Amino acid sequence: MKILLIYSMTPKLVIWFTLFVLCLQMGDTFDISINNEEIDNPGLIIKSKFKKYLPELQENLEIPITEKQQSIKESFIPRRINYPHYGLRSRFRKDIAISETTTTTTQESETSIATNGDSFDSDNGENKSDSSDDESSNNEGNDKSDATFKSLSSSSPTVVHSRRSWIKDFLIFKEQKVSTMSSSSSSSSGSLRDKSKLKQENKQLQSRIKNYDDTVSDPRDLKRWVRLIADEGKNEFGKKHSSKNYIQKNEIELDIEEFIHYLVEEQGFNSSDLEFLRLKNLDYGLGEIEKELNKLKEAKGSPKVISIGGEDENSAPLLWIKISKPTVCLVIALTFLLLG
């Protein structure tokens, strides 16, 4: 009977019937086994996992895909919220700040908020209000810092004066004196130069001739020839590079008498105070000499205050009179004679 029924059906119905039977068989064979244990209804388990990790999908099994996505894992990672941090940073800044940095940070924060979209604005409305409050306080702090910076720049700079270098002043004075002398002498010696030029033109050539008679007499004696040349070189080298003519670059040679004369005549020192410079066993360096001269100048420049017992704020007026000892003795003797 079954066979008759199947053959009595139209060919289209037969095809649909066979497909339905095959689907039932495939549904029965679809099973999942984990650790050799079969799991019933795996579709329900998958739905429950999606509800746990992505509750907004509810019963749908659609995976959200964002732009510029490279893998499926990125759809399950929660989106990072970029909070603006310039409000917190302004609380830890110093009083003096540069206004340009604040403007750049505000521009960057505005662009980042615009690119994030409407969902970011709806989720973080409270954060926007907090950031606007922080921004207003930040602008007020920047205005105060700009005002303090302008006041500091407008105030006159403090000038620190270093101690005077007397030796350097003496050397400069000496150079100026030499330059003035050379300029005055150059103007007066114009005619002398013309005369010297004429003399040089009329001069004959001068040459030194060395006598090598003892060496020429025996041309095979090379030892004496070499010794003679070596001795001449030694003498020339010794004259140029003798210890007397050698002066280090850091050393300065001073004429003590000329230096004392400069200090007395030009700077107003007392010659009696400068006697220590004439000592033969003076082991002072240039720095120590300048210290002593500064001490003498300060002692001379500070006015001497003599107290005569004037009125003070916390004391009664007093009058101090200095009387010599013999006058005191005479006054005491006269008082005894008059009273006795």
Curated annotation (Swiss-Prot):
Residues 192-202 have a biased composition (Basic and acidic residues). Residues 99-154, 181-212 are annotated as: Disordered. Glycans are attached at N127, N270. Keywords: Cell membrane, Glycoprotein, GPI-anchor, Lipoprotein, Membrane, Secreted, Signal. Residues 99-115, 182-191 have a biased composition (Low complexity). It is a lipid-anchor; GPI-anchor. This is Predicted GPI-anchored protein 46. GO terms for cellular component: extracellular region; plasma membrane; side of membrane. It is found in: Cell membrane; Secreted. Its main location: membrane.
